[in-house]
């Protein structure tokens, strides 16, 4: 059945397909695009997997894996979408990575969301899971307790997903000179963020968040600025599905959310120009890579461009985001 067609209910009424209908389509069409390269067997009971799609992420892949290992991720389900910079070879040697590859269209696969959905629903049903991009680093109060304690606290509140919007971070120097070493955490270098300018409003699929440095420097029009809302940690039951990277289905679970974490977004580093070139050449990103065209238009006008300005605030740990009003401490009222 085509996922966009209308189906008939038992009493003859016409209805839109359910999440299960939609998922069956994505499984058939998009999971078959993936070539299995390495699999480590079934997930152990209680293990939390993380699904990601990568392409030419050699700069950040090591700190990314190490960050989430420290938080308690037990297995990585990673799709390599045509890397030629050593990313695939590095992942093939990582003992906790299940690895697939494909040269299929990232855009037609829901910007990677359909691949993630297919893998998570097949290999990790009815358990807590994560999904994230390689430049996204989850922080929350009580990180030293790990994801297990965070999940327990969410469950006590009757929540089945974590609202953790993106927060763009950057250094005090130019983007070109913002270099991340293989054993260096990006937040050691990119410690600054815009202290104001975020706006929350209810959207079609949940709480929408716009603003931050990308709106300030690249998207003056609030409506066209990139979406920051994310729910990277979810309980993956039968009705949950990823149809976009920002709003998991069903959307009703995304409303009324309070941010108890943030995804620190380390996009503005020395490899940005190569990312721009790849995005413009392939046209595989949102609106024919509109975001990357905006980056190119702005960065080409000024040498040594830096996002840092007088309204920047320094990240010194999760509680600095609580103090700045960017999230709440989920453990603050627990004994």
What are the language-model segments listed below?
Residues 1-66:
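N-proximal low-complexity "stem/linker" segments adjacent to membrane-targeting elements
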Residues 2-25, 113, 140-335:
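Catalytic-site signature of metal-activated, phosphate-bearing donor transferases
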Residues 28-29, 86-131, 139-145:
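Active-site-proximal specificity loops/subdomain of glycosyltransferases
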Residues 55, 81-84, 94-96, 102-105, ...:
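An acidic- and aromatic-residue-enriched active-site/binding cleft used to recognize and process polar
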Residues 66-74:
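Short, acidic, metal-binding catalytic loop of nucleotide-sugar glycosyltransferases
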Residues 72-73, 125, 133, 158:
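Short loop/turn motifs at secondary-structure junctions
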Residues 74-82:
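Short beta-strand/loop segment that forms part of the nucleotide-sugar
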């Amino acid at each position: 059945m085509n996922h966009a067609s209308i189906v008939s209910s038992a009493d003859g009424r016409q209805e839109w397909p359910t999440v299960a209908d939609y998922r069956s389509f994505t499984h058939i069409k998009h999971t078959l695009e993936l070539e299995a390269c390495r699999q480590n067997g079934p997930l152990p009971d209680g293990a939390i997997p993380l699904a990601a799609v990568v392409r030419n992420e050699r700069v950040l892949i090591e700190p990314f894996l190490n960050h989430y290992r420290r938080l308690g991720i037990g297995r990585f389900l990673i799709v390599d979408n045509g890397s030629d910079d050593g990313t695939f070879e590095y992942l093939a040697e990582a003992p906790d990575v299940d690895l697939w590859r494909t040269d299929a269209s990232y855009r037609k696969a829901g910007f990677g969301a359909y691949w993630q959905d297919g893998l998570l629903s097949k290999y990790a049903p009815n358990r807590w899971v994560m999904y994230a991009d390689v430049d996204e680093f989850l922080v929350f109060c009580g990180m030293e307790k790990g994801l297990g304690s965070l999940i327990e606290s969410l469950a006590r509140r009757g929540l089945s997903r974590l609202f953790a919007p993106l927060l763009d971070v950057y250094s005090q120097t130019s983007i070109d000179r913002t270099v991340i070493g293989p054993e260096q955490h990006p937040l050691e270098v990119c410690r600054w963020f815009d202290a104001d300018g975020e706006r929350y409003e209810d959207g079609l699929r949940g709480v929408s968040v716009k603003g931050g440095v990308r709106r300030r420097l690249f998207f003056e029009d609030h409506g066209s600025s990139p979406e920051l809302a994310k729910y990277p940690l979810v309980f993956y039951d039968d009705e949950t599905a990823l149809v976009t990277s920002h709003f998991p289905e069903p959307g009703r679970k995304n409303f009324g959310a309070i941010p108890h974490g943030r995804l620190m977004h380390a996009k503005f580093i020395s490899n940005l120009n190569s990312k721009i070139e790849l995005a413009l050449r392939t046209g595989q990103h949102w609106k024919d890579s509109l975001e990357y065209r905006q980056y190119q238009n702005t960065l080409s006008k000024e040498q040594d461009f830096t996002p840092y300005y007088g309204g920047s605030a320094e990240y010194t740990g999760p509680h600095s985001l609580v103090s700045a009003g960017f999230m709440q401490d989920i453990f603050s009222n627990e004994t």
